[in-house]
Amino acid sequence: MYLSVPHYPSLKFTAFQSHKRNFRVFAVATNEAANYLPEAPILIPDGPWKQIDGGVTAAKGFKAAGLYGGLRAKGEKPDLALVTCDVDAISAGAFTKNVVAAAPVLYCKKALDISETARAVLINAGQANAATGDAGYQDVIECVNNLSKILQIRPEEILVESTGVIGHRIKKDALLNSLPQLVRSLSSSVGGAASAAVAITTTDLVSKSVAIESQVGGSTIRIGGMAKGSGMIHPNMATMLGVVTTDAVVACDVWRKMVQISVDRSFNQITVDGDTSTNDTVIALSSGLSGFNSNIISSLKSREAGQLQECLDVVMQGLAKSIAWDGEGATCLIEITVSGASTEAEAAKVARSVAGSSLVKSAIYGRDPNWGRIAAAAGYAGVPFDQMKLKVSLGNILLMDGGEPQSFDRAAASNYLRRAGETHDTVRIFISIGDGQGEGRAWGCDLSYDYVKINAEYTT
């Protein structure tokens, strides 16, 4: 399968096969940018929005850049990214629940407590700067202070994300030396967003970026985002970083609540391997530049807030699904939809349980329609339901109903799984646990031999 890549001049194309996925990877012949990744497929549903180009620079007021600063242990793939806003942007963040939180996570939490706005997000790949003590935290402070002088903004308006090897401090000298060029490279173009999306990746085989345009309260708004993640992915965030930008006009308290709701419906609903990272961070910025005539969204219960929430959900879920699709060693995306629960939260909990089951994931990789594993994972989710109302379908093939196995074409079910694996498509599992109105989704991927190989060889 060949995925499309954006146009860049003077490109040298090569092809390689990795974990049963054929990708066309291209490298720019200059030293400024090399070893670009292909883009993940766009995984957003149809709706009252339009998918557009631009990622984090699609919304008005935002610029981005990515370059190689010498932070990675190998190669010259971009490893340093910067996203900036021309104005003070309303800021929000969501972070790992891991108590061994990385230095940049601790810093961002404090910065968001101090200021309701931010102007920049600095991201490095190569070193996680987690479990690095006070020295690692001081590295963050020094990098922020240096960047604030170059950008001429307050230090507390700069947020930081890091990804890479735990226990390794940032290569501070390399980062500091790269900051002037990084700032000079800032662009509101699609290319600026694309280079930043590549720079934040680690074991990812694709970059993840998406943007949409929609109507909110009579104004045209844009929301875009980028994310990274492939392994160490589990609910309560994952080893994933994300930046989301919008030009919607929204109050800080409402925006921060919206972001947490969307994170719970997206990044907290994906799982690859059951490991919760030390560095999970999603930063969301709102420039408010969609229109000076727009009324500010000041109530979470307003019609306009509902429209913006839906758009934010779509972007974050699109990025989250791209992460699961790109799971280390994975051959397919798995989408679990649970209905009939008493609440959305209970449905989401059951969906997460099934998506995270190693036995379910292994069965899907083996193209085995083993509905018993699905039923068992639903049952141990910690959500009470009447097992006599349990219903399980694989695609449009009914496997279990009324708590009992159903007669089905096993060959057809196995072929459904096989086709998804051969084309890196989506396996859809539908579960009903009762008569309630609660519905929730979770996403994961199958578990292959390659997952063990990748992580056995990864430097720790």
UniProtKB/Swiss-Prot annotation:
Summary of pH dependence: Optimum pH is 7.0.
Keywords for this protein: Acyltransferase, Amino-acid biosynthesis, Arginine biosynthesis, Autocatalytic cleavage, Chloroplast, Multifunctional enzyme, Plastid, Transferase, Transit peptide
GO biological process annotation, one example: ornithine biosynthetic process
| List of catalytic residues | T239
Site described as Involved in the stabilization of negative charge on the oxyanion by the formation of the oxyanion hole, positions?
Answer: T163, G164
Look up the transit peptide and give its residue range: 1-26
Offer an example of a GO molecular function term for this protein.
L-glutamate N-acetyltransferase activity
Catalytic activity, EC: 2.3.1.35, 2.3.1.1
In terms of domain of life, where is this protein from? Eukaryota
Q: Which reaction does it catalyse?
A: N(2)-acetyl-L-ornithine + L-glutamate = N-acetyl-L-glutamate + L-ornithine; L-glutamate + acetyl-CoA = N-acetyl-L-glutamate + CoA + H(+)
Temperature remarks: Optimum temperature is 70 degrees Celsius.
Gene Ontology CC terms = chloroplast
**Where exactly is the site Cleavage?**
A238, T239
Residues that coordinate or bind substrate: T202, K228, T239, E328, N455, T460
Q: Which compartments does it reside in?
A: Plastid, Chloroplast
Where mainly located? plastid
Task: Identify the metabolic or biological route this protein is part of.
Answer: Amino-acid biosynthesis; L-arginine biosynthesis; L-ornithine and N-acetyl-L-glutamate from L-glutamate and N(2)-acetyl-L-ornithine (cyclic): step 1/1; Amino-acid biosynthesis; L-arginine biosynthesis; N(2)-acetyl-L-ornithine from L-glutamate: step 1/4
Q: Report the sequence similarity comment from the record.
A: Belongs to the ArgJ family.
Q: What does this protein do?
A: Catalyzes two activities which are involved in the cyclic version of arginine biosynthesis: the synthesis of acetylglutamate from glutamate and acetyl-CoA, and of ornithine by transacetylation between acetylornithine and glutamate.
Oligomeric and partner information: Heterodimer of an alpha and a beta chain.
Spell out the HAMAP family in the cross-references.
ArgJ
Name by which UniProt lists this protein = Arginine biosynthesis bifunctional protein ArgJ, chloroplastic
- Organism listed in the record: Citrullus lanatus
